[in-house]
Swiss-Prot record:
Major localisation: nucleus
Protein name (Swiss-Prot/TrEMBL): Zinc finger protein 1 homolog
Crosslink site: Glycyl lysine isopeptide (Lys-Gly) (interchain with G-Cter in SUMO2): K74, K114, K145
One Gene Ontology CC term in the entry: nucleus
Region annotated Does not affect nuclear localization pattern, chain positions: 171-404
Residue intervals of every C2H2-type zinc finger in the record: 184-206, 212-234, 240-262, 268-290, 296-318, 324-346, 352-374, 380-402
Keywords recorded for this protein, A-Z: DNA-binding, Isopeptide bond, Metal-binding, Nucleus, Repeat, Transcription, Transcription regulation, Ubl conjugation, Zinc, Zinc-finger
Cellular location(s): Nucleus
Gene name per UniProt: ZFP1
GO molecular function: DNA-binding transcription factor activity, RNA polymerase II-specific; RNA polymerase II transcription regulatory region sequence-specific DNA binding; zinc ion binding
Pfam name, any one: zf-C2H2
InterPro entries xref list: KRAB (IPR001909), KRAB_dom_sf (IPR036051), Znf_C2H2_sf (IPR036236), Znf_C2H2_type (IPR013087)
Domain of life where this protein originates: Eukaryota
């Protein structure tokens, strides 16, 4: 096939993000994007994608002059007139530039270029203008400075002022790109990162540094993103809404878990009782009911718990921390859920209704107790005489009869 036909530009294989969309990507998503874009760029270099400009067959100007003429922006402004917009020679050792940020478009300014795999061989010299390499890949220019030129040929590269420099245009071998992807190494654990900022963030795992503080409760975080998520507890913001039922959540992860309920996806099954769960950690926590394991222990009173969250709540008994305050009466509570229930004493709200008799209650737990009147359930049995009760408090009162205490 003629190489001037069926040409491929980088635009055909890239994905664009707006600045707002880019900022919303988490570090792992940005790394994935970077890897894919570099992979595509490398692949384009390994196939015949060169596009010739027939008009340049008749153009015999100096290559540098031609470069200044044909390295143009989409609005046809010569690159020299754009100054700092071009930026700098990009160095993959220190940075990665999103392939959408610099909207350059440039065409080949030489005669028809015969693709040759030897272009990727840095040990081979090339003669004359046929070796001037200017690959058309659309949206970004990636350059790598080389210490030496080949066969006296001058290769064009542009700095902030748009001046031509005597360096070879960036033609990367696939492996070389891979080596440059993660140049930042953690001195504690040797883990490698693509960005210096990710390395700095990672090191906080080792140092324990938590530079981001909540201005409401003074809790600190190692990452700014975690602080932003935490602050939704105070603001009540729930930006993630279920399209099925409209229920909103503070975190996207909670929405994903919730949506599994609609899809009835509960892939994790308990081998003891057959109960299924949407997440593996839920199964792990549930299995402690069967094993009796309580791995979370209070360092104040040695009480143990199935869940870490229950331990955290319990520890507030010892610290006396009650950060949730009622705006009506000033009473404070350890948990936000306790405050919500308390507020119903002021509003009179009773959202839990008995399906048998229509009686309403302010708390779900009270409704459960009430339902035992209709079902006749009495789960609390006296070990001495076998008498059963619907409430634990009534069993406790009854047991005093056996030990001789006055009720």
């Amino acid at each position: 096939m003629n190489k001037s036909q069926g040409s491929v530009s980088f635009t055909d294989v890239t994905v664009d993000f707006t600045q707002e969309e880019w900022e919303q990507l988490d570090p792992s998503q940005r790394i994935l994007y970077m890897d894919v874009m570099l992979e595509n760029y490398s692949n384009l270099l390994s196939v015949e994608v060169w596009k010739a400009d027939d008009q340049m067959e008749r153009d015999h100007r100096n290559p540098d002059e031609q470069a200044r003429q044909f390295l143009i922006l989409k609005n046809q402004t010569p690159i020299e007139e754009r100054g700092d917009l071009f930026g700098r020679a990009l160095n993959l050792n220190t940075d990665f530039v999103s392939l959408r940020q610099v909207p350059y478009k440039y065409d080949l300014y030489e005669k028809t270029l015969k693709y040759n795999s030897d272009l990727l061989n840095s040990n081979r010299s090339y003669a004359g203008k046929q070796t001037d390499e200017c690959n058309e890949f659309g949206k970004a220019l990636l350059y790598l400075k080389q210490e030496k030129t080949h066969g006296g040929v001058e290769y064009s590269e542009y700095n902030k002022g748009g001046k031509a420099l005597s360096h070879k245009a960036a033609i990367f071998k696939h492996q070389k790109i891979k080596n440059l992807v993660q140049p930042f190494i953690c001195t504690y654990c040797d883990k490698a990162f693509s960005f210096k900022s990710l390395l700095i963030s990672h090191k906080r795992i080792h140092t324990g540094e938590k530079p981001y503080e909540c201005n409401v409760c003074k809790k600190t975080f190692s990452h700014k993103a975690n602080l932003i998520k935490h602050q939704r507890i105070h603001t009540g913001e729930k930006p993630f809404e279920c399209p099925e039922c409209g229920k909103a959540f503070t975190h996207q992860s909670n929405l994903i878990v919730h949506q599994r309920a609609h899809m009835e996806k509960k892939p994790y099954e308990c081998s003891e009782c057959g109960k299924t769960f949407a997440q593996k950690f839920e199964l792990t926590t549930h299995q402690r009911i069967h094993t009796g394991e309580r791995p979370y222990e209070c360092n104040e009173c040695a009480k143990t718990f199935f869940k870490k969250s229950n331990l955290i709540i319990h520890q507030k008994i010892h610290t006396g921390e009650k950060r949730y305050e009622c705006s009506e009466c000033g009473k404070s509570f350890i948990q936000n859920s306790q405050l919500i229930i308390h507020m119903r004493t002021h509003t009179g709200e009773k959202p839990y209704e008995c399906t048998e008799c229509g009686k309403t209650f302010s708390q779900r737990s009270t409704l459960r107790l009430h339902l035992r009147i209709h079902t006749g359930e009495k789960p609390y049995e006296c070990s001495e005489c076998g008498k059963a009760f619907s409430r634990k408090s009534r069993l406790s009162v009854h047991q005093r009869v056996h030990i001789g205490e006055k009720p």
